[in-house]
Amino acid sequence: MEAEGRSERGKQKKGRLCGSLWPDSYPAAGTLTSTVDVSPQPSKNLSGVGVRRPRLSPQGGQRGRLHSRRRHRTTFNPGQLEQLETAFGRNQYPDIWAREGLARDTGLSEARIQVWFQNRRAKQRKQERSLLQPLAHLSPATFSGFLPESPACPYSYPTPPPPMTCFPHPYNHALPSQPSTGGSFARPHQSEDWYPTLHPPPTGHLPCPPPPTMLPLSLEPPKSWN
């Protein structure tokens, strides 16, 4: 009996100590378990009411980026394009002075003209590549069909003319020399008209040139200087 009384007293003391540890503001253990078992709806509401960070939709972000990267396109009138094309035909890489001169003539800025020349060079390179690309796939056999067939004898060479025979010139006969009083033969007088006549010679024959004139030697014996 005494043991049972001691155990009851110990339980009462433990109950008093637990009561002193729990403050009056906290509910009892039974009520605490009941308040913990609540539905998740209040937590959703609290999360909805809580502070949210501003989030941008992907479409809105892309629109902002496109708007920041958007460039202003420059429209050229026919007169400006004609002047630019003429300058491009003269020089595809103009320097700063040429670009400034074009800027004054066309009324555009130097930066716009520089960008136009860059785009024009890229366009020309693209056109050249598009023209050369179909030719690269063709084989040499395909080109042979476009070439004309060579005949058996493509060229006929004329036969060489017969050798020309020289006829004696009408003035080539020897003229008699006349002795002079000075003891020496005088040089025979030749006609200045030794050239052939104006009539053309026979075909395939040319006159021979006249022989050189021979000077006659003196017939007198040499005189002694004694």
Swiss-Prot record:
**Renumbered residue ranges of the record's region Disordered:** 1-80, 175-226
Which residue ranges have biased composition labelled Basic residues? 64-74
Q: Which residues form a coiled coil?
A: none
- Compositional bias of type Pro residues: which residue ranges? 198-214
**SMART domains to which the protein is assigned, alphabetical:** HOX
Polar residues bias locations: 31-46
* Source organism, top-level taxon: Eukaryota
Its subcellular locations are:
Nucleus
Q: What is this protein called?
A: Homeobox protein prophet of Pit-1
